[in-house]
Amino acid sequence: MAVVIRLLGLPFIAGPVDIRHFFTGLTIPDGGVHIIGGEIGEAFIIFATDEDARRAISRSGGFIKDSSVELFLSSKAEMQKTIEMKRTDRVGRGRPGSGTSGVGSLSNIIESVKEEASNSGYGSSINQDAGFHSNGTGHGNLRPRKTRPLKAENPYLFLRGLPYLVNEDDVRVFFSGLCVDGVIFLKHHDGRNNGDAIVKFASCVDASGGLKCHRSFMGSRFIEVMQGSEQQWIEFGGNAVKEGDVLRRSEEHSPPRGINDRHFRKRSHSKSPRRTRSRSPLGFYVHLKNLSLSIDERDLRNFFRGTDLTDEQIRFLYKDENRTRYAFVMFKTLKDYNTALSLHKTVLQYRPVHIDPISRKQMLKFIARYEKKRSGSPERDRPGHVSQKYSQEGNSGQKLCIYIRNFPFDVTKVEVQKFFADFLLAEDDIYLLYDDKGVGLGEALVKFKSEEQAMKAERLNRRRFLGTEVLLRLISEAQMQEFGVNFSLMSSEKMQARSQSRERGDHSQLFDSKDPPVYSVGAFENFKHHIEDLRQLDNFKHPQRDFRQPDRHPPEEFRHSSEDFRFPPEDFRHSPEDFRRPREEDFRRPSEEDFRRPWEEDFRRPPEDDFRHPREEDWRRPLGGLLQSTSGGHPQSISGGHPQSISGARPRSTSGDRPRSISGGRLRSISGAPERKISGTHQMKTSGALPMKTLGTLLMRTSGAPRRKILDALLMRTSGSSQRKTLGKLRRRTLDFLTILDLLVRILGARLMILEVTALL
């Protein structure tokens, strides 16, 4: 369902595009913007849904072209009635006044376009260098309505609906071919153009030609041209001219129709009164803010380059003999004045300068109040005191705050922190704005630690966040206090006083009576309504007693229950013995009997019977009797002699040298004896003990203490001193397994033993 919103405070320079941009993210159908205009800047906007209208209302107080606008809920009936009243007021008015001004409604615009399109034969040429466009019929050849006079009564015409930044040259181009003698622009109380002007022509003939330009375009706006009067010209600052002078000038200077008046301007310009005057004395004033403290008059003259500016037209403001960031500048011409306003937010010495128009009356009033404050009581100059509209230098002069608009109505402080993710913001530095009913406005105030951070944060202006285009504006603390927010007063002392008052129960002092009707999401505001309920502590006495009694009895009940649970642990203490004994009897002993003994019987003995005896029988005996037993012959067996391989060749080491023992000498047998026959005293005693072959096998299969025992047995069986010495070294060194393996392989010449030993490992 379509909903109509009424907008007030729309500046004259703003158009439908600016309104649609202000409501970015909301659905406005085609033809949904109706600008009424007038002194109050009225307009009606149609939104597609109720949700869009509700979110649009929350943006009330925002800025369109640096002008604050107010939004109200309206209806189609009110919109139609307002449009009809404005149209009737314009038609029934005999002569224009300085009162309300307006822009034609949509129905009037369509009617005018149709009427002018049907009279396309009256067109005339237009100066193409002007840069403006007409509606296809020309400026001076429109067929006038029956209700409008075709001939001017005097050389004065009243214009309505002019753009904000219009100047005299634009008006002369608008009346191309006519001799314009002077222009006076009407202004608001703040010094801005209100869209109205009075034009004085050289003659009534030129004024009659100007009436034909009614509802022609100046840029993108329709301009209403009506009959004026000499009284209005004088009232708004013009000088009266004698009638004879007017007739003489009209005869001399009125050019033929269609001829450009450029070569007449100098002569007519010299005889006309001053072309721009305001209600106040001569001059146009601007208010400069956020200036650098080191700036001087020369810097401002360079800043306003191209304007006629002297040091006498510049005035800086001081506080306690210290310069502030404010200044006033007076311009002599409207052109210089418009040039200065176009430099708004231009950076000067690393600071964006804010240039606002101001009237002479307001400037003098501000200076008088400021001078009074300087010479006034020290109470007004104490820290924290701010004037009603402007705050002087100090901390309030620095622009540390940013006013944020166009957030969703339910935005939170955490979301604001995410928007300023590049800046370290605490929740205390963020202030959310709410209406009287506690509904979010989608606006917030954020304070930064320094001006540099605030200026960097302002670069996020018009960045999309949460589906909307967020608008940012850098403001000072004084401007922030106009919202009713003062971060400087929210100090730790005040927070401590609030906490102490809350502990005392004096909840009436938690919030200052001077606090504005703006709600925050702070910690105190969340409990604002609950504090009143907490005052009635009598309602909570009985529940507290009921809860305290059960807290005392349960420990006694559990003390008795703990005694009952002491006996089960005694019963369970015997269980570890039951579990430990089976571990020793059932697991440890069977592991020795079942695993270790079969390992010796099944694995160690069978290889001795099945593998080693066949090797000796099958491989060594067929070699031609080279291998002998341990009782005689050449020591080709384990007891000594040159060890032969399976092929009968003499084995060599990896390097190609003769195989040597560990001690570095010639290769010896296990007993360490040199290569010779075992006879006489060198014959080993093997009676009543294990043979040397069995001891060698056990030596290969054991390590550590068992190996030392085997070496002791070999020492007992060895008679030679050198052999005993070698075995003693082996026993002391605890031979490496690989060394013993290499020694046994060279002595026994068995290759399969490597696989067997590897499997055992």
Swiss-Prot record:
Modification Phosphothreonine, positions: 276
Keywords: Acetylation, Isopeptide bond, Phosphoprotein, Repeat, RNA-binding, Ubl conjugation
One Pfam family in the UniProt entry: RRM_1
Record field: compositional bias (Basic residues): 263-278
Biased composition (Low complexity): 661-672
Record InterPro entries: ESRP, Nucleotide-bd_a/b_plait_sf, RBD_domain_sf, RBM12B_RRM2, RBM12B_RRM3, RRM4_RBM12B, RRM_dom
Region annotation Disordered: where it falls in the sequence: 120-147, 247-278, 372-392, 538-690
The name this protein goes by in its record: RNA-binding protein 12B
Organism: Pongo abelii
